[in-house]
Every structure is written in structure tokens, then in C-alpha cells.
Amino acid sequence: MRPLRYSINVTLDGCCDHREGFVDEDLHRHATENLDQADALLFGRVTYEMMEAAWRPPAPTGARPDWMEPFAQAINAAKKYVVSSTLEQVDWNAELVRGDLGKAVQRLKRESGKGLFVGGVKLPQALTELGLIDEYEFVVHPRVAGHGPTLFAGLSTHLDLKLVSRLEFGSGAVAMRYEPRR
């Protein structure tokens, strides 16, 4: 069974608005390594549309630094599954996921391969409620946003996690990986 991994950038006060983190070469390299651990990505509509707008080729010449190219290539090549009840179709190497979320994700996890990687905020919360995420990574940035959406707001019950690794970056960000205590 393929593991389902979740990684998100978050500030010290729990804000998970992508505009509040900061990006550097080390963090992008780490994100690319995360993508390389998965056969496919799982997005909700909002995250899919945001990532497609940011990363789908062609990027205008000089639009981003050269060190972002490995991530751009990895995300463009990746198979994507998009959970949406409103989109009629997707492309960018993507397939719509409809119907019962738990059953659909269990089916994807049963397929052979390296793993699945989920991004965003709302979809991972729903998957957490269903007990389907096998690994959580929080990349905590040394910033207090003071506003914005927070991670797991409204989760119906607490989630106990066990730290399995920690990685510090020169920027002061820390990537902490956890597995659920079951």
C-alpha cells in the first residue's frame, strides 16, 4: 500500500497562507525531494488551480530563478488527482476524483508505487478526519503572521503524532516529520 504524505509550510503562529512563508533554494530543494518520494499528487480544487497557475509551463523567461526549475519539472511531470465536485474537467496530467472521498483515497493508496503526496489545507483536514494520512511534515518558518488561515482549524478531535525526523534550514525554518500515533 502506498503511503499518503502531507507537507505544508506554516508560520510560528500556525498560519498556513502560502504567501506568509518565504522561499529559498534549500526549501525548494527539500520540496523537490518530497515530490520525488511520490508517484502522484492529490489536490483539492483550490490548491490544484493555485499550483497550475504558478507552475504549469511555459514560464516566461526569467520569471523564476534557475534553482526553482527542478521543482517545476517535478510538479509538471507528476500525475495529479484533483478532488472536486465543481470542476468539470482537468488537464495538466490530472484526473478528477469524485464520490466518496475515503473510498477513493483508499483505492489510490492500494495501488502499487512509492506514495501519494497531498497538499493544501481543506483536503488534508478531511483526510486527517478519515485517518488516511500516514505522515505529516510541517515546515515551520520563523515568522509570526498574525492573521490568515490556520492549520486544522475545526478538527473534530485531537491528533496525536510521533516525531520521526527533524531538519533545520539556514533560513531558520525547521521541517518536522510526524507519524500518527495509532
PLM regions and their residue ranges:
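Non-cysteine beta-strand/loop elements that form the S-adenosyl-L-methionine
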Residues: 139
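Portal/gating segments that form or line small-molecule/metal binding sites
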Residues: 1-132, 142-182
